[in-house]
Amino acid sequence: MEDFVRQCFNPMIVELAEKAMKEYGEDLKIETNKFAAICTHLEVCFMYSDFHFINEQGESIIVEPEDPNALLKHRFEIIEGRDRTMAWTVVNSICNTTGAEKPKFLPDLYDYKENRFIEIGVTRREVHIYYLEKANKIKSEKTHIHIFSFTGEEMATKADYTLDEESRARIKTRLFTIRQEMASRGLWDSFVSPKEAKKQLKKDLKSQGQCAGSLTKAFRRTSPALRILEPMWMDLNRTATLRASFLKCPKK
């Protein structure tokens, strides 16, 4: 999976994902599914923001990268991908400037046109289930939620999808491509199935000659940000069960 991630995603996204995992003591050599999940989420956030600007009249416009008018104000402020200290600094600055209510949890983006923070979700499960989980966690009507799935489904607060249809289609196509590329390499099942993920992890540990028990710390210390990403490939109860199964090394 790690090799796939490095081949599939932009080096900048990979670097940001590595820093995020390092910040919370995660080992990307072991938590490879999480590595892929973080990269996917980062890419969707960047694609959400791409090409969207605000003109002098305050209208949202789409500008291609080569357009000379690219000096226009970006419609979205990207918060995801920054270290926590810098991310909160950006959020506080936005709140002070715009008067927006400070969110309890770090959001992914800020929309200067609609004057609201946005939480982006990517899931392979039912979009409405993941949406409800996000809404229950955030508990704020001020933060807009937009969920995408690998099957092309999406769900957003009050059915307000923020972006034009073409921009959202680009994101859906990219997610579908990632799924197809994973499947062609035999990685998709382990990405979405706890059972397959467990098999793959045992195989990886065996090939590295490591004892799974020595990795207990890595499994227990999961950042709040990464917990948000976990439902992309397994629910939290199954995650806990999977981690518990690695607390002991098998007798030789």
From Swiss-Prot:
Matches recorded under Pfam families: Flu_PA
GO BP terms: viral RNA genome replication; viral translational frameshifting
Cell location: Host cytoplasm; Host nucleus
Gene3D superfamilies the record matches: Influenza RNA-dependent RNA polymerase subunit PA, endonuclease domain
Record site: Important for efficient shutoff activity and nuclear localization: 195, 198-199
Signal peptide: none
Primary localization class, coarse: host cell
Alphabetical keyword list: Decay of host mRNAs by virus, Eukaryotic host gene expression shutoff by virus, Host cytoplasm, Host gene expression shutoff by virus, Host mRNA suppression by virus, Host nucleus, Host-virus interaction
Domain free text: The probable endonuclease active site in the N-terminus and the basic amino acid cluster in the C-terminus are important for the shutoff activity. The C-terminus acts as a nuclear localization signal. The C-terminus is recruited to host protein complexes involved in nuclear Pol II RNA processing.
Name of the molecule in the record: Protein PA-X
Protein's organism: Influenza A virus (strain A/New Zealand:South Canterbury/35/2000 H1N1)
